[in-house]
Every structure is written in structure tokens, then in C-alpha cells.
Amino acid sequence: MFDIGFLELLICGVIALLVLGPERLPTAARAAGRWIGGARRMVSQFTSELDRQLKAEELREELRKAGDVGLDDVEKTVRGALDEAKKYEHMILPDDQTRKPRPAPATRRVTPPSPEAGEQPEPPHEPVRDEAAASDQPSDSSPTSPSDKYS
């Protein structure tokens, strides 16, 4: 990483021994080791995360391409089938149905005529009940015994 050779490392150790002294050198070496270890872990985490993101992006791109290819094939197939069906449409449908439908003509809003002073509007008709059919159906108010329910 830094390309430090043995000679450079030995020179750094001697300078540290002279500056820090023999009492503080082990503590400083441990702290330096922790810093270097933390830096290595951060670099490895960063590179692994970067690799994961690149792989995920490549996978997304492949999925996009695969999805586009699949949709294009389906679209071509459907368009081909529709074009072929239009060729034979005149054989299946009568002549008046093969033409494209025209839009409906615009209609005016029709208001019902207002009843004149002498005329009364008819009340709505109620359905007429057949009394014979009504008598066949039991009413809720008729007394029934518990044995009737199970027979």
C-alpha cells in the first residue's frame, strides 16, 4: 500500500524510540496499530460496498435489457397477429361492420312537457300482488311450533 521497505521501517522505529522514549513507545505502537487496522477495515468496507453497488447496477441493467427484449418480442407478435386478423376481417364480418364506427350524432337535451293546469300526472304504478301466491307463503306473524321447524 505505502511500499515501505524494511530499512524505512527500521529508521521510523529508531526515530520513534528517540522521540517518545522506551516508556511511551509500546503505547504509541498499539495506538498506531489500531489506527492502521481501522484504516484498513474502512478501505476494505468501502471497496466491498463499491463492488456490491457496481454488481447491483450491472444486474439492473441486464434486467432492463432482458425486460425490453421480452416486451419488444411480445409487441411484435401481437402487432403481427392484429395485422393478419385485419387482412381477413372482411371475410368474417358483414360489409357494414367492417367500416369503422362513426361517432354518435350530437343529441339535444329533451325536457319532458310540463303538465297543464287541468291535467294531473299519473301516480307511479305499484305491482299487483297475487293473493293466491301470497297465501302460500307463511307470514312471520303465524305461530309455529318447534316441531314444524324440523319436519
Swiss-Prot record:
Gene this protein is translated from: tatB
Name assigned to this protein: Sec-independent protein translocase protein TatB
Record organism: Marinobacter nauticus (strain ATCC 700491 / DSM 11845 / VT8)
Protein family (similarity comment): Belongs to the TatB family.
Topology of the protein relative to the lipid bilayer: Single-pass membrane protein
Transmembrane residue ranges: 1-21
Gene Ontology MF: a single term: protein transmembrane transporter activity
Low complexity biased stretches: 134-151
Composition bias, Basic and acidic residues: 87-99, 122-132
